Each structure stands twice: as structure tokens, then as C-alpha cells.
Regions:
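Hydrophobic alpha-helix-in-membranes signature
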Residues: 12, 115, 135-138, 180-181, ...
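Outer-membrane beta-barrel signature, preferentially recognizing the C-terminal barrel domain
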Residues: 1, 7-63, 70-100, 135-141
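Outer-membrane beta-barrel translocator domains and adjoining extracellular loop/strand segments
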Residues: 14-21, 65-74, 119-128, 159-160, ...
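Hydrophobic, well-ordered secondary-structure elements that form the walls
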Residues: 4, 38, 56, 92, ...
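Hydrophobic alpha-helical packing residues
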Residues: 4, 15, 147, 240-243
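C-terminal beta-signal and adjacent terminal beta-strands/loops
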Residues: 64, 162-171, 179-181, 187-243
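Gram-negative outer-membrane beta-barrel transporters
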Residues: 50-62, 81-168, 200, 211, ...
Length: 243
């Protein structure tokens, strides 16, 4: 199946953008622009044994007054408008699900994105080297792989993520503080579902950053190493008729 779309974009600054202390900028302009997108998708299946689906799309986005938070000489970040930004790229996704038998099921998912986001406005000064460069903190490449194995009401999920290097400066200077190196991330989750008379109960335990990867999302702010989450979800069956 083929698809195509043209979208008119318009975004107001958030309250944080305008009034966060310190760093909010009440003088921000609204973002506006157009997004052009086209793509292909497919889906095939065999009875109830397996399903295979995938999609690939190309997008081309032209935004005026793009809002971005950048570091200041005062030691904190503040949002500014970039007059013209050209963001474009390719996004690919594939899904595969198979019933191994009546109780066991396996699902696989993969994504890949190539997303350059280029500043195409005018330089604000003679020292401004940001024009024609990738926007700070936006990776050009990213990918994910995940697998889910279920047995009746049990589920085991593994997710792997990759993010390419990100620049921290608008000039894209490659220095010790000018870029953040690429990193890999692995998370694993074990879950169990229960169906009670009055509610559906879900228990999940997750190990984030399974291999204790050292990485940064923002310069000088290390992210947690291996860490653990526990989740309990309760969905009441109020109003449902008993079978």
C-alpha cells in the first residue's frame, strides 16, 4: 500500500519554554512549517500461524522558528528560535509474529531511522558556524530491535536501542565537550498477568541498562547505570457483565 501526505505544522511554545526558571524565554515565536511524507507498507499472514508487516517512509520537513534549548554562558539552558530548519530522512519498520504452538508465541520488531535536522537560517554573527550543521542533541541515526516471547499469561521482552553520536554545539565541533559518543542500550522485562473476578492484574519487573552502559543524554549529566523497575497495573472490571 502506498501513502502520501502534506501537513501544515504549527506549534506554540510550552509553558516551560516560556517561563521555566532559570532559562525560560517569553519572547519565543511560534513554530510553523510544512511536512511532506510518502511511503510504502505491506502485511502478509498465513491463517493464524504468522504475520509479517513492514513499512518504509520518507519525510521532508521545513520549519520556521524551530524551538531548541541551547546552553548559555550563564551555566543553564534556554530556548531560542532558529529561523529555518530542514529536517528530512527515512524511517523503516518491520514486525513479525508467529504462534509456535497453542501456548507459545514469539514477536519480533525492528526499526531504523536516518533523520538529519539541518539549520538553514542566517548566521546571527560572524562567529556563528551553525548554518548547514546538524542540530545539537539530535542523533542522525537510531535503531531498535525487540523480541517478545509469551507463554500463556507470562511474557519476556528484550529491547535493544542504538543512537549515533550527537553534537552539543551548534557548530558541530568535534571536541571532548562538543559531542556525545554513540551508545547502545538493552532492557529486559518479565511480566505476568492475572485475571481476577473484579479486575485484571499485571505485574512487571524490568532491568534497565542491562549491561551497565555509560552514556549521556545531556552534556555533563551521566545517566543511570543498571537499574530496576517494578510495575503493578490494575484494571477494574466495573460494569462488565459476568460470563
Amino acid at each position: 500500500m502506498a501513502k502520501a501526505s502534506i501537513t501544515r505544522n504549527y506549534r506554540f511554545p510550552t509553558l516551560n519554554d516560556l517561563y521555566f526558571l532559570p532559562g525560560g524565554n517569553p519572547a519565543l515565536n511560534n513554530e510553523s512549517g510544512f511536512t511532506y511524507e510518502t511511503g510504502l507498507s505491506f502485511s502478509v499472514d498465513k491463517d493464524k500461524v504468522y504475520t509479517l508487516s513492514g513499512s518504509a517512509s520518507w519525510f521532508d520537513q521545513h520549519i520556521n522558528d524551530w524551538i531548541i534549548w541551547l546552553p548559555t554562558s550563564k551555566g543553564f539552558y534556554s530556548p531560542v528560535n532558529l529561523k529555518k530548519v530542514h529536517a528530512y530522512g527515512v524511517e523503516v519498520q518491520a514486525d513479525y509474529a508467529v504462534a509456535i504452538d497453542k501456548a507459545w508465541k514469539l514477536g519480533l520488531n525492528g526499526t531504523f531511522a536516518w533523520t538529519p535536522s539541518i539549520h538553514e537560517g542566517e548566521p546571527t554573527s560572524k562567529a556563528d558556524q551553525s548554518v548547514g550543521k546538524q542540530l545539537p542533541y539530535i542523533p542522525e541515526y537510531s535503531a531498535t530491535l525487540s523480541g517478545r516471547l509469551t507463554y500463556r499469561s507470562w511474557g519476556l521482552l528484550y529491547k535493544w536501542c542504538y543512537y549515533s553520536e550527537r553534537y552539543t554545539m551548534t557548530s558541530n565541533a568535534v571536541s571532548y565537550t562538543g559531542h556525545l559518543p554513540p551508545y547502545l542500550m538493552s532492557n529486559v522485562t518479565l511480566e505476568k498477568g492475572f485475571s481476577l473476578r473484579w479486575a485484571d492484574l499485571s505485574l512487571k519487573g524490568t532491568v534497565n541498562n542491562l549491561f551497565d552502559e555509560e552514556y549521556l543524554s545531556v552534556l555533563s549529566r551521566p545517566m543511570p547505570g543498571i537499574n530496576f523497575e517494578f510495575f503493578i497495573g490494575i484494571t477494574p472490571k466495573w460494569g462488565k457483565k459476568k460470563k
